[in-house]
Amino acid sequence: MTWLESIILAIVEGVTEFLPVSSTGHMIITSALMGIKSDPFTKVFEVAIQFGAILSVVVLYFKRFFKSCDFYFKLFVAFIPTAIVGLLLKKHIDTWLENVWVVASTLLVGGIVLLFVDKWFQKNETEGEEEVSYQTGFLIGCFQCLAMIPGVSRSAATIIGGLTQKLTRKAAAEFSFFLAVPTMFAATAKSLYDEKELILESTDKIPLLLLGNVVAFIVAMLAIKFFINILTKYGFKAFGYYRIALGALLLILLAMHVDLQVV
């Protein structure tokens, strides 16, 4: 992996991780365009730079993270469903992750769903709740389990979950960001621990990992601010059309037998 490739992948990670557009789908397209082949270090790199994205949430919402213990208890309750389902379905999840057809199909279907989300939950903006209860947090965590299917988008699943519990778009999006911290931290830490031998053997590539995290951190902060602004003003429809276009593009490329891989 070159320095330029690491920067571009980190930018893609930072932009897409917290938007309801599926970071996995974008990594597939980006890697195909740049000719990046799947290898052990590339997989470790894409996992490791998620730490930078996670940190951006903590920095942006610093006061919320250190406000009260109740905040952490709610995140813990919301994290429980994902932890349980993740442990039970790990082998199946690993298999799904290798299937680009699954990613393309879920991108397309998820995009169609997003086209109707604003209409379904229109009253939330005037009558919705701003505070997340324990029950709401748990149910959002259940929705997050859907994101284990590649292409669904963790952000899209959890925000829609929040909307079903009568949260405003902003409140649902922010709790989605908060829930990403324990969820992504646990998944990333576990993946890196499993690859600890490879990391120890690749000390010469540590600068690439550090650069990737810095870039992902900066870009993710900007993406979160952009997303909240767009979401509160215009809703989900634009993201829906974008997902449909991306999913269709992936399906066309697959039909043309273009070599696409989940790197």
Swiss-Prot record:
The chain crosses the membrane at residues 1-21, 41-61, 69-89, 97-117, 132-152, 172-192, 208-228, 238-258. Keywords: Antibiotic resistance, Cell inner membrane, Cell membrane, Cell shape, Cell wall biogenesis/degradation, Hydrolase, Membrane, Peptidoglycan synthesis, Transmembrane, Transmembrane helix. Coiled coil: none annotated. It catalyses: di-trans,octa-cis-undecaprenyl diphosphate + H2O = di-trans,octa-cis-undecaprenyl phosphate + phosphate + H(+). The keyword Nuclease does not apply. It is a multi-pass membrane protein. Signal peptide: none annotated. The keyword Cell inner membrane applies. It is found in: Cell inner membrane. One of its GO terms (cellular component) is plasma membrane. Its EC number is 3.6.1.27. GO terms for molecular function: undecaprenyl-diphosphatase activity. Its main location: membrane. It is an enzyme of class 3 (hydrolase). One of its GO terms (biological process) is regulation of cell shape. Belongs to the UppP family. HAMAP family: Undec_diphosphatase (MF_01006). PANTHER family: UNDECAPRENYL-DIPHOSPHATASE (PTHR30622:SF3). Catalyzes the dephosphorylation of undecaprenyl diphosphate (UPP). Confers resistance to bacitracin. Bacitracin is thought to be involved in the inhibition of peptidoglycan synthesis by sequestering undecaprenyl diphosphate, thereby reducing the pool of lipid carrier available. This is Undecaprenyl-diphosphatase. It comes from Cytophaga hutchinsonii (strain ATCC 33406 / DSM 1761 / CIP 103989 / NBRC 15051 / NCIMB 9469 / D465).
